[in-house]
Amino acid sequence: MCEWREDGWTAHRPSAMIFDMKILVVGGSGLLGHHVLEELRLRGHETTTVARTPRDGVDRVADVTAASEDDLRELLAGHDGVVFAGGVDDRRIDKGPVGPRLHDGNVAPVVALLAAARTVGCTRAAVLASYYTYFDRVHPEWGLAAKHPYVRSRLEQARIARETAGPDLPVAIIEVPYVFGVAPGRVPEWSRPVVKWVRSWAPLFAPRGGSAATSARGVGIATVDALEDASGADIPVVEENLRWADMLSRLAGAAGKPRAVRTLPAGVVRAVFRLGGRVNGLTGKEPGLTVEHLDALFLRELFVDPPAPRSVDEALRETAKA
């Protein structure tokens, strides 16, 4: 069932009786973690915010990647559930093999958290992940896991998380696409260079494809829905599907620099990514998404059918003006 909210959202409400939960949110000072916390509080649930560095609103300062089992059990004691809103972003590029870094950032902390959560009796969990696992599931012929270490790490994260949690601790995997919106001191990482570009008067170019998109608030709502349901499902989050050209055009308009977006020929897109892959190879850098295979992503329509279509314009404007 659903209920109409005064803020204009139609929020899902599970049919079973909802009790007041106490939820620990790891990465709660980040963009998505902030909106998960806001939604939990809006619905009357108790929260504990965990982050690596102290700042306003952080209840516990802890690095879960380095915490002991005893520390994690103490952190989780008395909570009904846990949300992991941290991890290594797909855009991070460093020298050396990326696989171990992705495992240490995306897999190991989730396993440690869920092992502790199971021990102390938590009954629900959610992991904020990536919509690339959705596409690997529905389009195995694309070979995303074989081509991209980041996708492999997210698949491993989901699999081992559920194995660790066991049958009495359902784990929802929140599959997050391109996100718009802001939080105090936070914007989407991908948006920084793009917003700088659209704020200039430089010509705008885009491939022919596009992507599912959502607001940070939409991620918060989907995550809390999953927690209230004690869901163990894979949950792709989408409010609107945008072509790249439309996304750039709307961002430019929101930034006060409206202008046309030209379509890049597919051959040019492929050549650019091949060149980028060679440069990374020469410099010894390995990204989470293999650059020479990115053309297949940017030239496709990475669309997801939205269960409740909604414009992301408000969040898009926030992003462009941040």
Where are these regions (language model features)?
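N-terminal Rossmann NAD(P)H-binding glycine-rich loop of SDR-like oxidoreductase domains
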Residues: 23-43
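N-terminal Rossmann-fold cofactor-binding loop
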Residues: 49-54
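NAD(P)H-binding glycine-rich loop region in Rossmannoid oxidoreductase-like domains
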Residues: 55-58, 62-108
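Conserved Rossmann-fold NAD(P)-dependent oxidoreductase catalytic core, especially the SDR/UDP-sugar
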Residues: 108-152
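Oxidoreductase cofactor-interface core, primarily capturing Rossmann-like NAD(P)-dependent enzymes
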Residues: 138-238
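Substrate-binding strand-loop-helix patch
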Residues: 210-217, 235-254, 267-271, 310
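Terminal hydrophobic/aromatic helix or amphipathic segment near a protein terminus
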Residues: 244, 248-298
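Amphipathic terminal alpha-helices
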Residues: 296-322
